[in-house]
Amino acid sequence: MAVAPNALATWANAITAGRLVLSPIMFLVIPDHTRGSWIAFGLWFLLCLSDGIDGWLARKHGTTSSGAFLDPLADKVLVLGAMFTLVARDVFWLVPVAIIAGREVVISVYRTLVASKGVSIPASQTAKLKTLFQQLCVGFALWPWFADDRALWNTMLWIAVVLALVSGAQYLWWSRITSRALADAGVA
């Protein structure tokens, strides 16, 4: 059953809100060593799975304006919060995480400005792949079976950085096209 575009109380939004609420707990259970933690890994897995489930529900029942705002926010809080927690625990290096965070801020501001003009910019396939690699690098760093394999999750982290920069460049390139279209339509 389709939901109204302005609906707030949807299953997808409830799952997204749950991800936002559980994110700080996730950060608290991240260990301060590089041996991983089954509790942290399990919670990370569930929270990442919830991202897929709320997306599936939104596609099945229709997206809402609140979900279009809350879902990317929950993703950024969860991923960047976990990454910065891992930086604070001396597991991740600050530089790649700072690059990813900088890209997220720039693109989020851009998408918000464009949205204020009535234009919705969906996530690109490259951006979705970036999110996947961000989730994987954190997951492997927390998973006790792979936590000591720094080469594996550092490679994934740097792949996420490259994907962040490429998708960020795509958004900025598309912004030129969008700006021209808005100007031609008299909206800009």
Predicted features by range, described:
Residues 16, 21-66, 82-98, 152-165:
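Membrane-embedded alpha-helical segments that form the functional core of polytopic membrane enzymes
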Residues 21, 49-57, 73, 77, ...:
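Active-site His/Glu-centered metal-binding helix of metallohydrolases
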Residues 30-34, 88-90, 103, 115, ...:
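Short helix-capping/hinge motifs at transmembrane helix termini and TM-loop junctions
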Residues 18-26, 72-85, 107, 130-141:
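Core segments of transmembrane alpha-helices
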